[in-house]
Amino acid sequence: MMETNNENKEKLKLYTWDEVSKHNQKNDLWIIVDGKVYNITKWVPLHPGGEDILLLSAGRDATNLFESYHPMTDKHYSLIKQYEIGYISSYEHPKYVEKSEFYSTLKQRVRKHFQTSSQDPKVSVGVFTRMVLIYLFLFVTYYLSQFSTDRFWLNCIFAVLYGVANSLFGLHTMHDACHTAITHNPMTWKILGATFDLFAGASFYAWCHQHVIGHHLYTNVRNADPDLGQGEIDFRVVTPYQARSWYHKYQHIYAPILYGVYALKYRIQDHEIFTKKSNGAIRYSPISTIDTAIFILGKLVFIISRFILPLIYNHSFSHLICFFLISELVLGWYLAISFQVSHVVEDLQFMATPEIFDGADHPLPTTFNQDWAILQVKTTQDYAQDSVLSTFFSGGLNLQVIHHCFPTIAQDYYPQIVPILKEVCKEYNVTYHYKPTFTEAIKSHINYLYKMGNDPDYVRKPVNKND
């Protein structure tokens, strides 16, 4: 049997990541899983989860996406074997070498929880109730902020509420849709994602690349996680792999203020789908005609609804810009702070993949001798576990560790799973990072910014050194 396996392996071709990356479309779709290359083109129309998530994975190392997006079954491993065509000889991004029993144990116990409780991990009354209420809140606050009154200060208050409504829309409906965590219907995910373009004027397609392919697979990895930034000169230092400048000593003061422009920055940046065709180190897959149409329509609807219609209603241009900036700053602060208190805080782990290139200008990534799932725990912090308000207003991201280990499970179930996670962490001696309140979580973020900007013993680490 061993000889047969070796013979089969010799017959299979060896591919570089660059070769695999060219097969990234619906009619020619390859992926990498656990060092093996698969041509799953014939599986695309048959995939129960639809084609979009496969297209997102196309031409990439999808190992950890493949594992974390099928938490309730192991059938996908046997199914994919028939599409195996070769092995990978090089990697575009960090490779997580080790697979421990931690994640398999955690998945087994979570599966058992849903089986014994007869619950569907993607469906609950709360999911749809939240969705309806948030859409209603979004529409009502939009009307109030744009058309209900010409009183300046009242419009300012409504603009704040509209910013909050947009934040909740992003953290609940859009976020659930990008992770396929709401219903089992791919068309539902597509429609809900399109409403992000239409109502927020921001690209759902771009977000899925930044968040699902980038942040979730390479959490807190400098030069791979888009959320950390990648420029040599950055407005803040948050990893030990960055050069520190004199102004960073004040980053704990100015950085939280600048978080307010996060939403505006994202809306401007998402055009890179068509120009740079990458978000930092994360390549964009070729965009389809329908996704292009959604992108363009979303920008048009945004301009009409946020500028043209309010001007027709008789808002002055100066007042309109004021109301717009208020809602955008609220949205930016809300979202940015929600993300920062989970990953950019004290005691969490940061890593890097080096910007070293071979003769063909291909990056040579770091190999992480750790388990991907364990690193999700080491790079993430939870807070206010028992607070219903914190769970709602954060979109369940106060329980971020569970979300990273089980991104496809509806956020309503996170509180049920946390005790299981803590139990498994204790068994495997993995530290579970937790703060009792949101206040303590944000304090930890500010303290971390201060430390990184002011520590007199700070020495920049080489990007190929990962502790």
UniProtKB/Swiss-Prot annotation:
<dbReference type="InterPro" id="IPR005804">
    <property type="entry name" value="FA_desaturase_dom"/>
</dbReference>
<keyword id="KW-0479">Metal-binding</keyword>
<comment type="similarity">
    <text>Belongs to the fatty acid desaturase type 1 family.</text>
</comment>
<feature type="binding site" description="axial binding residue">
    <location>
        <position position="47"/>
    </location>
    <ligand>
        <name>heme</name>
    </ligand>
</feature>
<feature type="transmembrane region" description="Helical">
    <location>
        <begin position="317"/>
        <end position="337"/>
    </location>
</feature>
<keyword id="KW-1133">Transmembrane helix</keyword>
<keyword id="KW-0276">Fatty acid metabolism</keyword>
<keyword id="KW-0444">Lipid biosynthesis</keyword>
<dbReference type="GO" id="GO:0016491">
    <property type="term" value="F:oxidoreductase activity"/>
</dbReference>
<comment type="function">
    <text>Fatty acid desaturase that introduces a cis double bond at the 5-position in 18-carbon polyunsaturated fatty acids.</text>
</comment>
<keyword id="KW-0472">Membrane</keyword>
<dbReference type="GO" id="GO:0006629">
    <property type="term" value="P:lipid metabolic process"/>
</dbReference>
<dbReference type="InterPro" id="IPR036400">
    <property type="entry name" value="Cyt_B5-like_heme/steroid_sf"/>
</dbReference>
<feature type="transmembrane region" description="Helical">
    <location>
        <begin position="293"/>
        <end position="313"/>
    </location>
</feature>
<dbReference type="GO" id="GO:0102866">
    <property type="term" value="F:acyl-lipid (8-3)-desaturase activity"/>
</dbReference>
<keyword id="KW-0349">Heme</keyword>
<keyword id="KW-0275">Fatty acid biosynthesis</keyword>
<feature type="transmembrane region" description="Helical">
    <location>
        <begin position="123"/>
        <end position="143"/>
    </location>
</feature>
<feature type="short sequence motif" description="Histidine box-3">
    <location>
        <begin position="400"/>
        <end position="404"/>
    </location>
</feature>
<feature type="transmembrane region" description="Helical">
    <location>
        <begin position="187"/>
        <end position="207"/>
    </location>
</feature>
<keyword id="KW-0249">Electron transport</keyword>
<keyword id="KW-0408">Iron</keyword>
<dbReference type="GO" id="GO:0005886">
    <property type="term" value="C:plasma membrane"/>
</dbReference>
<keyword id="KW-0443">Lipid metabolism</keyword>
<dbReference type="InterPro" id="IPR001199">
    <property type="entry name" value="Cyt_B5-like_heme/steroid-bd"/>
</dbReference>
<protein>
    <recommendedName>
        <fullName>Acyl-lipid (8-3)-desaturase B</fullName>
        <ecNumber>1.14.19.30</ecNumber>
    </recommendedName>
</protein>
<feature type="short sequence motif" description="Histidine box-1">
    <location>
        <begin position="175"/>
        <end position="179"/>
    </location>
</feature>
<dbReference type="GO" id="GO:0046872">
    <property type="term" value="F:metal ion binding"/>
</dbReference>
<feature type="domain" description="Cytochrome b5 heme-binding">
    <location>
        <begin position="12"/>
        <end position="89"/>
    </location>
</feature>
<dbReference type="Pfam" id="PF00487">
    <property type="entry name" value="FA_desaturase"/>
</dbReference>
<feature type="binding site" description="axial binding residue">
    <location>
        <position position="70"/>
    </location>
    <ligand>
        <name>heme</name>
    </ligand>
</feature>
<dbReference type="Pfam" id="PF00173">
    <property type="entry name" value="Cyt-b5"/>
</dbReference>
<feature type="transmembrane region" description="Helical">
    <location>
        <begin position="152"/>
        <end position="172"/>
    </location>
</feature>
<dbReference type="InterPro" id="IPR012171">
    <property type="entry name" value="Fatty_acid_desaturase"/>
</dbReference>
<keyword id="KW-0813">Transport</keyword>
<dbReference type="GO" id="GO:0016717">
    <property type="term" value="F:oxidoreductase activity, acting on paired donors, with oxidation of a pair of donors resulting in the reduction of molecular oxygen to two molecules of water"/>
</dbReference>
<feature type="short sequence motif" description="Histidine box-2">
    <location>
        <begin position="211"/>
        <end position="216"/>
    </location>
</feature>
<keyword id="KW-0812">Transmembrane</keyword>
<keyword id="KW-0560">Oxidoreductase</keyword>
<dbReference type="GO" id="GO:0006636">
    <property type="term" value="P:unsaturated fatty acid biosynthetic process"/>
</dbReference>
